[in-house]
């Protein structure tokens, strides 16, 4: 019985001390300032994590045979999600050919290499002129290359 009473008193003492420390009773001003600094640091870290830098890319175009163009794209995603970077093909002006755009599949975070082709003959129409491939992130062109066909 005495052991139970002693354990109960010890438990109450520990609970009382713990409540004082969480309520800020009896603590020093340094401890309060430290808690504020910790909260500010956590907020700053959260804001930095939310502010992801935009990806970087390089694109180069080569002619393949009579009617294809190949775009080789190197991308550093900088922690941006899959589908955030797009490849946009611009057909020559006045050629009556279609522009296309699609997301680039992310295989690696840095130095991700991918490629895509476009056919310069659409139906009976041969789309001669200046073809441009743009790498786009958040409606901003981050890399571009052109070739004359």
From Swiss-Prot:
It is a lipid-anchor. A lipid is attached at residue 20 (N-palmitoyl cysteine). Keywords: Cell outer membrane, Lipoprotein, Membrane, Palmitate, Signal. Disulfide bonds: none annotated. Residues 1-19 form the signal peptide. It comes from the Bacteria. PROSITE patterns: PROKAR_LIPOPROTEIN (PS51257). Its main location: membrane. One of its GO terms (cellular component) is cell outer membrane. A lipid is attached at residue 20 (S-diacylglycerol cysteine). It is found in: Cell outer membrane. InterPro entries: FN3_dom. This is 17 kDa major membrane protein. It comes from Francisella tularensis subsp. holarctica (strain LVS).
